[in-house]
Amino acid sequence: MSGNTIGTLFTLTSFGESHGPAIGGVVDGCPPGLELSVEDIQQELDRRKPGTSRHVTQRKEPDTVEILSGVFEGRTTGTPIGLLIRNQDQRSQDYGKIAETFRPGHADYTYWQKYGIRDYRGGGRSSARETAVRVAAGAIAKKWLKQRYGVTIRGCMSQLGDIQIPFESWDAVSRNAFFAPNETILPELEAYLDRIRSERDSVGAKITVVAEGVPVGWGEPVYDRLDADIAHAMMGINAAKGVEIGDGFASVAQRGSVHGDELTPQGFASNHAGGILGGISSGQDIIAHVAFKPTSSIPQLRHSIDKHGAALEMQTTGRHDPCVGVRATPIVEAMMALVLMDHALRHRAQNADVSVDTVKR
């Protein structure tokens, strides 16, 4: 399995499985001198961890992070930063019945076909449990970006199933389990998910992430465009099925006279492009939307096959989210941070001496 690393200059390599002893990662390329503590990382992990509401999996993982290397006397040393999160609430017995069968919608079938072996306990390496490591690494990137460039990265749930969530304020996001930017709609969201659960079903969601304060110039055309790398990172999240930058697919119905963001001496007049032009940051807010599919594990009888190809009916058991998107916001933020820090370092490496007089906004 060769796809466990993301980044060019600032990289994360993750390891571990859902029901193994631990998950972890190695963050390489972080500049020396960044003040970094366990608390800096833990506060981000606490936003993502399971068992925090009735609408997410009831697996109780404290997600306590350990920094194994790369930090001395509270500062990064420039060497690889080792991160470890021990698994403490595995129930492998819940998965014994699927050792030789393939759950519909999961990676069971493809992992078996590709590797000829799979860890069936909780999905093994394909489990979203691994995303805790991304959030931990993203916390480092978030802090560096904020201190070095004043970049702020914030996300929210903008749609749950067929319910659009109007944006009200960023302050509302931290006050509810949905990461919804609108508190008046919470009763509707609660009732909707309760109904989905009572029907023994699941539903998808859309997460919106905004990076504010990104300077002009980040991105490496033509193959490592900033928007291309953002899309690559987001599609690497479990259950992600689509990514939009700026107006995204709505651009199909727009005219050029609308979509093209006009410039004025004071800056851009609009931001349909989502803060990226030609694969390079424009200085505007970078805006992305990520679509997450419904949870594949639902307590209904489904048709499938076993590893010998025999037809069967199966019903998934275990502890699962009725909507994986409920906990996805910190993960989406983390992936945005990882990409932006990598591109900040790449831009600095080649273009640090470039200076132009045109207004930058």
Swiss-Prot record:
Pathway: Metabolic intermediate biosynthesis; chorismate biosynthesis; chorismate from D-erythrose 4-phosphate and phosphoenolpyruvate: step 7/7. FMN binds at R125, S126, S127, N238, A239, G278, K293, P294, T295, S296, S297, R319. GO terms for cellular component: cytosol. One of its GO terms (biological process) is chorismate biosynthetic process. Its cofactor is FMNH2. Reduced FMN (FMNH(2)). Keywords: Amino-acid biosynthesis, Aromatic amino acid biosynthesis, FAD, Flavoprotein, FMN, Lyase, NADP. Its EC number is 4.2.3.5. It catalyses: 5-O-(1-carboxyvinyl)-3-phosphoshikimate = chorismate + phosphate. It comes from the Bacteria. GO terms for molecular function: chorismate synthase activity; FMN binding. Pfam families: Chorismate_synt (PF01264). InterPro entries: Chorismate_synth (IPR000453), Chorismate_synth_AroC_sf (IPR035904), Chorismate_synthase_CS (IPR020541). NADP(+) binds at R48, R54. Homotetramer. This reaction introduces a second double bond into the aromatic ring system. HAMAP family: Chorismate_synth. Belongs to the chorismate synthase family. This is Chorismate synthase. It comes from Methylobacillus flagellatus (strain ATCC 51484 / DSM 6875 / VKM B-1610 / KT). The lineage of its organism: Bacteria, Pseudomonadati, Pseudomonadota, Betaproteobacteria, Nitrosomonadales.
